Amino acid sequence: MRLLALLLMVGAAVAVPREDGRIIGGHECAAHSRPFMASLNYGYHFCGGVLINNQWVLSVAHCWYNPYAMQVMLGEHDLRKFEGTEQLMKTDTIIWHPNYDYQTLDLTSCSSSSTILWKVTHAVAPIPLPTSCPVAGTPCSVSGWGNTARDGDEVYLPTLLQCMDVPIVDEEQCMKSYPDMISPRMVCAGFMDGSRDACNGDSGSPLVCRGEVYGLVSWGQGCAQPNYPGVYVKLCEFLGWIERTLEAYP
């Protein structure tokens, strides 16, 4: 059985990809309450991802500097210790979206195989793709293991999975925050007062709304900055490509 990872990123040339990532203003998730959460790592956590079916993980392409050395860990909560719930996969194939462009449209898929076969448990389970596009004000949540310190503070990387509730930001407000940088493939979420945000190391982590994954942490202006909400990949815009890719690798 293969585990396949599908990677997407929508960014802008002057934006800051959130490679080191963080959840600012969040709290520890209930253990294994996000069974779809994946940790991408090179022996240490580097980016997030999300399990979307029995063999695919979704994340953002800018996380994969050396994809063949990357491991995909499922069933994690506490990164410090072995909990007995973890299931590990390794990458063996990368497939780029035909319109790949790091500055504007960055989509990649990679397939992985392992002698360790993952199975659904209380700690490992997929989440559905969106059945609609996000609407302003929709309550959502984001999770990750990224830095929890604000800009200018000493970096603090939590070992316990962090969660945070965020609303979808109105498209007009999103475009005002990032003039000429927001495309139809992006969606903003967060608080305009800068009180809560996802950031670097949380890249690729899922934005979950109404039990479906609506977006992936992508980029932003700093972290938890007033008037600059987080920018996410808008997954509803990529459903056709995702479905075609999954069909090509049954």
From Swiss-Prot:
Coiled-coil spans in chain: none
Enzyme class: hydrolase
Keywords: Disulfide bond, Hydrolase, Protease, Secreted, Serine protease, Signal, Zymogen
GO MF annotations, alphabetized: serine-type endopeptidase activity
Domain Peptidase S1: 23-247
Residues annotated as signal peptide: 1-15
Catalytic activity: Preferential cleavage: Arg-|-Xaa, Lys-|-Xaa
InterPro entries according to UniProt: Peptidase_S1_PA, Peptidase_S1_PA_chymotrypsin, Peptidase_S1A, Serine_Proteases_S1, Trypsin_dom, TRYPSIN_SER
GO biological process: proteolysis
Compartments where found: Secreted, Extracellular space
Residues marked Required for specificity (site): D197
GO cellular component assignments: extracellular space
Name of this chain's protein: Trypsin
Organism: Pleuronectes platessa (European plaice)
